């Protein structure tokens, strides 16, 4: 017998589209078999009906032959021979009737009954298991949808536990029903062969027994053939029993796995994450926009193929291209209060698709895999080794810390070297750029820690700056909170969110800011850090001040003369950063870069900083100051008007822009 195709029980839990596609082939085969079995049963019942009719007909014939004697023929003389002959024929017909009756009974037991049992037992079982599998799959999809909607923040642990148990129960139920369904379909491939041959064996045996007295030669030839067929059926029966035992043992082993196999995100604290993947596959939730403000999430099967991200819905024969991953960027994002979301951005900076994984492990592995693929590692001779090396370097460079003191302690001595390539020692506005782009190691030392918290908390800075001042219990600021701002010609405020800061080795080029942006964003993506501190950045002609929007207390203050470099991101216009030169107690100076995300364009913040530096320069020359004041419009109170109050086109709330760019 040729090998029989079968469904792999090990793939039942994953429930991939490939398995579903193969399952549909088995289901189509079962449907075809059901239709054919019904037609075959009708034909066999017709034969059985004809045989029963033959029994009734021969019985009636025998009676009718005997009835000849009782007929009152007008010319009935000489009928005794006929009557005796008919009596003999009646006995022959009675004997023949016995043979037909025996044949009819044998056809019912060996031909019709097996095919009816096959239809009512095996085919009905497959149909019932199919319905149960469909119900279990629907319950699992509903529970996964409910689990996916769990909020990320302030979530009820009891609800989370209950939903997790519900997902595990639904997944276990789907696994059990799929295993039973797969086993039934696999066994059906054997049983259908037996079901087709066993009835015909019974039919043939019945006919042979019926004609045995007059067909010894024929029966001998048929006996040899039927013997071989019976041996084949017996061998199939042996194979079925062995396969059934094998599937039973395999089913028990698969059902005895740890409970964590069914529970999503089972190891939240310390999942085993493989950051060296160059290919990945699994189910993700895809965010689709259905209107101006409405979205839907669809659970689909995604997999990578070379440098492409593919998607394959259930029932589809093959996957389709969703995103070209070459030179793309990926990072974790907050989206609609859902957990484990990440966004793929195209090389031109446009936002791509947003996907949601079912666990932290899956989320980080997808991010790492896409990040590896985007670097075209898969084209190298040994992509796994390249991925391991790159991720080791990245982890060393982006180890996060949240203590400003630790950051200063771990800074390398090379970060405190004073740069000698400034245009002059009076802190010119724009440092002189180098002739060629420096390497990343020349800008930032490998392994430099990144600080994700703001420099000082608001309460600590309040105690340091205000001393014994009375604290307003209502959080309102005092009029004299920032006395130096009242005397400043320049006052401009922006809404910013702090992304991170790190020590740098040089401030001779803006490339150091771009490299710091890259490392900070990469660190946030790798370590799954979403939290950002929002502040008001006030730019004056003396300083840059970060103000708590709730308490109006200054979080950090940088002298404008200590700002040696500032730049906005070339593609993401809302990213802005600046380099601060701070003197150390040892007499040397340290350089640190600070990265922010702004509600407005970063170029506007850079323009304000640049103007503040110009004011510092021209304040030494009254004539130059007068020319500068004439060249720039002023407000009624004599402050500089830097920016209009019109919102950007790509922001939805004008009030946010007026708040972000209002004058203090």
From Swiss-Prot:
Tell me which residues make up the PH domain.
Answer: 277-375
Record's PROSITE patterns?
PH_DOMAIN (PS50003), PID (PS01179)
Q: Name one GO molecular function term.
A: phosphatidylserine binding
Question: Which residues does the UniProt record annotate as the domain PID?
Answer: 488-637
SMART domains (UniProt xref): PH, PTB
- Keyword Transferase attributed: no
Q: Any keyword Iron?
A: no
The BAR domain, residue ranges: 3-268
Where in the cell does this protein reside? Answer: Early endosome membrane; Nucleus; Cell membrane; Endosome membrane
Instruction: Report membrane topology.
Output: Peripheral membrane protein
A Gene Ontology BP annotation from the UniProt entry: cellular response to hepatocyte growth factor stimulus
The region called Required for RAB5A binding is annotated at 1-428
Main localization, broad class = membrane
Q: What GO cellular-component annotations does this UniProt entry give?
A: cytoplasmic vesicle; early endosome membrane; early phagosome; early phagosome membrane; endosome; endosome membrane; extracellular exosome; macropinosome
- Show the ranges annotated as biased composition (Basic and acidic residues): 654-664
Q: Region Disordered: list its residue ranges.
A: 643-664
In this chain's numbering, which residues are marked as the site (Breakpoint for chromosomal translocation)? 234-235
Q: In which tissues is it expressed?
A: High levels in brain, heart, kidney and skeletal muscle.
Q: How does it assemble?
A: Homodimer. Homotetramer. Binds RAB5A/Rab5 through an N-terminal domain. This interaction is essential for its recruitment to endosomal membranes as well as its role in cell proliferation. Binds subunits of the NuRD/MeCP1 complex. Interacts with FSHR; interaction is independent of follicle stimulating hormone stimulation. Interacts with APPL1; the interaction is decreased by adiponectin in a time-dependent manner.
Q: What disorder is listed for this protein?
A: A chromosomal aberration involving APPL2/DIP13B is found in patients with chromosome 22q13.3 deletion syndrome. Translocation t(12;22)(q24.1;q13.3) with SHANK3/PSAP2.
The written remark on domains in the entry is: The BAR domain is necessary and sufficient for mediating homotypic and heterotypic interactions; associates with cytoplasmic membrane structures; mediates interaction with TBC1D1 and ADIPOR1. The PH and PID domains mediate phosphoinositide binding. The PID domain mediates phosphatidylserine binding and allows localization to cytosolic membrane structures and nucleus. The PH domain allows localization to the plasma membrane, cytosolic vesicles and distinct nuclear and perinuclear structures and is sufficient for RUVBL2 interaction.
Protein task: Multifunctional adapter protein that binds to various membrane receptors, nuclear factors and signaling proteins to regulate many processes, such as cell proliferation, immune response, endosomal trafficking and cell metabolism. Regulates signaling pathway leading to cell proliferation through interaction with RAB5A and subunits of the NuRD/MeCP1 complex. Plays a role in immune response by modulating phagocytosis, inflammatory and innate immune responses.
Protein name, please?
DCC-interacting protein 13-beta
Naturally occurring in which organism (per UniProt): Homo sapiens
The root-end lineage is: Eukaryota, Metazoa, Chordata, Craniata, Vertebrata
């Amino acid at each position: 017998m040729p090998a029989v195709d079968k469904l792999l029980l090990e793939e039942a839990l994953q429930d991939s589209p490939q398995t579903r596609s193969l399952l549909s082939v088995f289901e189509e085969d079962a449907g075809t078999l059901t239709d054919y079995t019904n037609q075959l049963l009708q034909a066999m019942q017709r034969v059985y009906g004809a045989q029963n009719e033959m029994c009734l007909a021969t019985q009636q014939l025998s009676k009718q032959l005997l009835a000849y004697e009782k007929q009152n023929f007008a010319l009935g003389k000489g009928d005794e021979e006929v009557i005796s002959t008919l009596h003999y024929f009646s006995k022959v017909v009675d004997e023949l009737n016995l043979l037909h009756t025996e044949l009819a009974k044998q056809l019912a037991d060996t031909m019709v009954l097996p095919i009816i049992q096959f239809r009512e037992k095996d085919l009905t079982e497959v149909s019932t298991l199919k319905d149960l599998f469909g119900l279990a799959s629907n319950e699992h999809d509903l529970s996964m949808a409910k689990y996916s909607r769990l909020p990320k923040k302030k979530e009820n642990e009891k609800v989370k536990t209950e939903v997790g148990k519900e997902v595990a129960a639904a997944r276990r139920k789907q696994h059990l029903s799929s295993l039973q369904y797969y086993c039934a379909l696999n066994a059906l491939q054997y049983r259908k062969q037996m079901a087709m041959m066993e009835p015909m064996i019974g039919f043939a045996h019945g006919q042979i027994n019926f004609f045995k007295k007059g067909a010894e030669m024929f029966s001998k030839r048929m006996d040899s053939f039927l013997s071989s067929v019976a041996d084949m059926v017996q061998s199939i029966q042996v194979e079925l029993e062995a396969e059934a035992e094998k599937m039973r043992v395999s089913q028990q082993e698969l059902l005895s796995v740890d409970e964590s196999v069914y529970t999503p995100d089972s190891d939240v604290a310390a999942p085993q994450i493989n950051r060296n993947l160059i290919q990945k596959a699994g189910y993700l939730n895809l965010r689709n926009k259905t209107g101006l403000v409405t979205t839907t999430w669809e659970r689909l099967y995604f997999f990578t193929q070379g440098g492409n991200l593919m998607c394959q819905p259930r029932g589809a024969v093959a996957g389709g291209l969703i995103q070209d991953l070459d030179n793309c960027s990926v990072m974790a994002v907050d989206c609609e209060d859902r957990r484990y979301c990440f966004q793929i951005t195209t090389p031109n900076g446009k936002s791509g698709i947003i996907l949601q994984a079912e666990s932290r492990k899956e989320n980080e592995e997808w991010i790492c895999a896409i990040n590896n693929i985007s670097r075209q590692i898969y084209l190298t001779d040994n992509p796994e080794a390249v991925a391991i090396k790159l991720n080791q370097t990245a982890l060393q460079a982006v180890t996060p810390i949240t203590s400003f003191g630790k950051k200063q302690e771990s800074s390398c001595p090379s970060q405190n070297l004073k740069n000698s390539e400034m245009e002059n020692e009076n802190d010119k506005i724009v440092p002189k750029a180098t002739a060629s782009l420096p390497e990343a190691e020349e800008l930032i030392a490998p392994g430099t820690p990144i600080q994700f918290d703001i420099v000082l908390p608001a309460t600590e800075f309040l105690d340091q700056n205000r001393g014994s001042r009375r604290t307003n219990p209502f959080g309102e600021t005092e009029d004299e909170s920032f006395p130096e701002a009242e005397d400043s010609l320049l006052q401009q405020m922006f809404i910013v969110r702090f992304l991170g800061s790190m020590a740098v080795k040089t401030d001779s080029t803006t490339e150091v800011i771009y490299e710091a942006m890259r490392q900070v964003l990469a660190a946030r993506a790798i370590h799954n850090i979403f939290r950002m501190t929002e502040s008001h950045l006030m730019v004056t002609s003396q300083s840059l001040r970060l103000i708590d929007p709730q308490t109006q207390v200054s979080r950090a203050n940088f002298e404008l003369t200590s700002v040696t470099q500032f730049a906005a991101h070339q593609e993401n216009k809302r990213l802005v950063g600046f380099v601060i030169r701070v003197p150390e107690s040892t007499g040397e100076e340290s350089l640190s870069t600070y990265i922010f995300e702004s509600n407005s364009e970063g170029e506007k913040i850079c323009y304000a900083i640049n103007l503040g530096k110009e004011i510092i320069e021209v304040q030494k020359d009254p004539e130059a100051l007068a020319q500068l004041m004439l060249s720039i419009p002023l407000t009624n109170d004599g402050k500089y008007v830097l920016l209009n109050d019109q919102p950007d086109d790509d922001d939805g709330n004008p009030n946010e822009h007026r708040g972000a760019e209002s004058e203090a």
